[in-house]
Amino acid sequence: MSCPVIELTQQLIRRPSLSPDDAGCQALLIERLQAIGFTVERMDFADTQNFWAWRGQGETLAFAGHTDVVPPGDADRWINPPFEPTIRDGMLFGRGAADMKGSLAAMVVAAERFVAQHPNHTGRLAFLITSDEEASAHNGTVKVVEALMARNERLDYCLVGEPSSIEVVGDVVKNGRRGSLTCNLTIHGVQGHVAYPHLADNPVHRAAPFLNELVAIEWDQGNEFFPATSMQIANIQAGTGSNNVIPGELFVQFNFRFSTELTDEMIKAQVLALLEKHQLRYTVDWWLSGQPFLTARGKLVDAVVNAVEHYNEIKPQLLTTGGTSDGRFIARMGAQVVELGPVNATIHKINECVNAADLQLLARMYQRIMEQLVA
């Protein structure tokens, strides 16, 4: 199958860019963008490669994405080696095919076609690309955004190429994401012998009523755009492994995926009040990995919906479900942020794949979005 989008996707898949190693992917993208008149600024931080590229001036539409991929797992379980792209029955297989090298290829080819047709486009077209979205993400998009904000860069619209679709490309568009807040909680007791409980203080017993009440809380009921806030206990650890020792500490880690009905400070206050109510001795550490954000109907959402309806003849659902994405950092710039990408059914799995025709369709959609906003 000869197609510039498929060919570029295959070239990217052949580069085993395990986070945060870019493995030469960005050099390939930069070469293509510079050839059509983009100015490229590399913005590397520690072991992470990033670049910010732009062409033109005025209202800015940025395309954002990541070159890194998650590990392939057991390569012997793949129908072909994970970094050797293969097309079977119209499906392109390879690690990163859906998440998100196919989107990157579609973005770049769309930009090439757009610039060829609109060499003097009125707005500014930009790219924000990182090699660390899948791992810690500490030195990726967040650092680039901080640098851009420090010099008052303008970003009006941002299209993130994360695989948003469920069954066919464009059936779901993400116009927001929930916030994510993790609590690392240690309940302190006194270690002792199980035969002498009066000489010890069992933190597991002490914490049980607190945890019971915590999991029963209805944090909110969500709203028009967000499902209800969810709290899940992810890890819990106590004890020495011996059956005759009362543990001295209990560690509990729980995560909130929260809507715009709450703030992280409101959640923290409620958890701390509950700890005090149960008279627990504790230490607590919080990690806020992202605030919730929402892009209401406006120029970007309308342009994306128009592009999907034009090429796939379906009306996309606007959803805020799923995990976090780098869109949470870009939203800080005041930009309208929307995610549109391929079907996500196989992301992070053995035999990750994407419908090759979907990538061609995605490139056309991306180009139509450019034409509506910065032509």
Curated annotation (Swiss-Prot):
Zn(2+) 1 binds at residues 66, 99, 162. It catalyses: N-succinyl-(2S,6S)-2,6-diaminopimelate + H2O = (2S,6S)-2,6-diaminopimelate + succinate. It is an enzyme of class 3 (hydrolase). Its cofactor is Zn(2+); Co(2+). Keywords: Amino-acid biosynthesis, Cobalt, Diaminopimelate biosynthesis, Hydrolase, Lysine biosynthesis, Metal-binding, Zinc. Zn(2+) 2 binds at residues 99, 134, 348. The active site is at 68, 133 (proton acceptor). Binds 2 Zn(2+) or Co(2+) ions per subunit. One of its GO terms (molecular function) is zinc ion binding. Its EC number is 3.5.1.18. Pathway: Amino-acid biosynthesis; L-lysine biosynthesis via DAP pathway; LL-2,6-diaminopimelate from (S)-tetrahydrodipicolinate (succinylase route): step 3/3. GO terms for biological process: diaminopimelate biosynthetic process; L-arginine biosynthetic process; lysine biosynthetic process via diaminopimelate. Homodimer. Catalyzes the hydrolysis of N-succinyl-L,L-diaminopimelic acid (SDAP), forming succinate and LL-2,6-diaminopimelate (DAP), an intermediate involved in the bacterial biosynthesis of lysine and meso-diaminopimelic acid, an essential component of bacterial cell walls. Belongs to the peptidase M20A family. DapE subfamily. NCBIfam families: dapE_proteo (TIGR01246), PRK13009.1 (NF009557). This is Succinyl-diaminopimelate desuccinylase.
